[in-house]
Amino acid sequence: MSTFMANKGNIERKWYVIDAAGKPMGKTAVVAADLLRGKRKVTYTPHADCGDNVIIINASKAILTGNKMEQKYYRTHSGWVGGLKETKYRILMQEKPELAMRVAVRGMMPRNTVTKDSLKRLHIYAGEAHEQQAQKPEAYEV
């Protein structure tokens, strides 16, 4: 009997919706990253993109524990000298909560080419409404 190896022909992708309201951003990001990679499937293969589609709603209502709203920064760099831009998470959560959640999920994923394809299946919304009703996503508890 040979070992099962997942490939594009034998992967079944499901849709999951995660409600982030009142839950820590890190715990929500860990669950989303595991679903995107397919680590909670029996057919998980590390080198293959065998994960599911994930929808995160209420990203603006996710919580950061401790003083992270004031002490944690989102940093980007343009590549030029003096091109570092810093934004406190308090401001980032008010203006772009989807970006804050995407950065958290990306930080929980490995740094490889499978991650790039997996993150394309991540859909994040600040509010409760989402556009993927036709896919009939299953609710997933954190």
Language-model-detected regions and their locations in the chain:
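Ribosome large-subunit tunnel/peptidyl-transferase-proximal elements
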Residues: 1-103, 109-113, 131-142
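Internal, active-site/partner-interface "lid" segment
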Residues: 114-134
